[in-house]
């Protein structure tokens, strides 16, 4: 690691943990967790997520970011709390993505339109539409703002080639012009 920084977290039931964020190659960050209240510090575990520039002020509610490779490379945010083992645990189903590039479709796509009132409607969105990813569970769907003002859910499955994603059985590369994947 090139640098490290940490937070000491005190839980309401008297446990104390050190969350240590490390900066590694390619700006990759990760967290090691140590328990501090049992005499000698003990290693609890590793998490491939980090707080970056956020602050951890409350062990019951803090933000961590995870690198996601879903229709591009993004950092997804979830709210976490310290669980019984001392590791971060989230009740959030999906990651929120704050910074994303617009993807332009190269074919008509079957999506679920997410209505403002909470209802959902199946629709086909025409080729040439712009999609900006804003939320994903990292495994089965990506939600996007469309350039016509609507929001939609794109169902995804692990790519049939062993990498990437398929949308309706078609490789993501055949559905969009390009992706902002890192590396």
Where do the protein language model's features map onto the residues?
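Solvent-exposed strand-loop boundary residues in beta-sheet-rich modules
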Residues: 37-40, 148
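Short aromatic loop motif centered on NTY/YTY
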Residues: 5-8, 16-32, 40-118
């Amino acid at each position: 690691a090139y640098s490290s920084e940490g937070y000491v977290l005190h839980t309401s039931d008297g446990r104390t943990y050190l969350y240590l964020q490390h900066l590694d190659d390619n700006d990759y960050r990760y967290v090691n967790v140590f328990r501090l209240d049992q005499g000698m510090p003990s290693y609890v575990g590793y998490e491939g997520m980090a707080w970056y520039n956020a602050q951890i002020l409350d062990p019951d509610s803090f933000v961590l970011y995870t690198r996601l490779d879903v229709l591009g490379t993004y950092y997804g945010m979830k709210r976490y709390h310290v669980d019984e083992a001392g590791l971060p645990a989230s009740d959030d189903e999906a990651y929120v993505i704050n910074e994303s590039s617009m993807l332009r479709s190269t074919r008509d796509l079957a999506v679920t339109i997410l209505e403002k009132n909470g209802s959902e409607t199946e629709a086909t969105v025409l080729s040439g539409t712009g999609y900006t990813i804003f939320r994903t569970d990292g495994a089965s769907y990506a939600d996007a703002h469309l350039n016509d003002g609507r929001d939609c859910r794109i169902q995804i499955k692990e790519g049939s080639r062993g990498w990437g994603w398929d949308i309706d059985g078609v490789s993501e590369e055949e559905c969009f012009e390009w992706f902002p994947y890192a590396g």
